[in-house]
């Protein structure tokens, strides 16, 4: 976490083959998001192409354009940067309403009412529920309560992030990228460069894996800016190291579950709280966290009450993003582990407690946006798994 006090590029510019070097003083000062989401994006507009305020190790400081990789690497080593190092907040438990702000700037904005407040380090916050959770839990014969930590993880797709840009005969900026969000890229580049979408054509070939990482425009805006400024073709290809330290991993979440049941094994209440660490920027932060509850709690269809609360906080770590499961992975791990612990306390077969409580076709699901499970074969799937695995012969362990 630091402010750039001074950046010297004059020596680097003299390297043969260097076309241009851009710093935070050279880029548009309109904030945007690189999350691949439908407009208006739930993710806050909290990024600049280059910012005087760098928020994590991996934040870009300069864009260097040259004729080949060798001259660019040489020039990069000649850029001198003087920083004012600031205190950092690295623990999400300390971020909310803490003294260190990741985004103190007034130009930060949220387009959607997701409970975001940059002056509280909040990317999103919400609560919903049905029934009186505290009353029902107090009536339960058995209650389990634990916090489960799911750490950030990288997609590590075979093809790293890469983008090629060029101007065509119609004066359009062409952006060819390894992306999962080709239409969103057009809008993101438009916002980042401050140019009309009609001046941009975004397209993609087949991509060598994405798994959600490429639902964020990690690489596109930098060569797009270079080509728009110079009129010349440009490309960027992340190394494997760069793909690991400056991209879009899974959100680190701490999920606290309280779950109660009667002595017959009927699960009556679930209280779930998720603390999600979005890192230095808010890409997909407000949306992944919702699935940690809305995809986990509705698996149990006969609850008398539920409550789901969450906070998504900024920290001075690499920004997170989309990853297969999109937040449901973290929540389901926590809830299913709680069900196992509940079964152990009750002395029940964990398969039996699931068959007894799982959502069935036709059931109303208040925890899933008030929808009905119009098509659901979860009970049949679990029965088939039980049969194929020989569960009754293996449980309890002989």
Regions found by a protein language model. Name each.
Residues 1-115, 143-146:
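Flexible, low-hydrophobicity surface segments
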Residues 1-24, 62-83, 162-230, 287-298, ...:
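Alpha-helical support elements that line or immediately flank enzyme active sites
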Residues 20-25, 56, 144-148, 175-177, ...:
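General beta-strand structural signal in soluble alpha/beta enzymes
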Residues 22-59, 93-95, 99-106, 184, ...:
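Short, surface-exposed loop/turn segments at secondary-structure boundaries that line and modulate
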Residues 37-40, 116-163, 169, 252-338:
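Glycine-rich loop/linker segments at domain edges
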Residues 102-193, 358-398:
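Helix-loop-helix junctions that connect adjacent transmembrane helices in secondary transporters/permeases
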Residues 153, 225-243:
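FAD-binding glycine-rich core of flavoenzymes that anchor FAD
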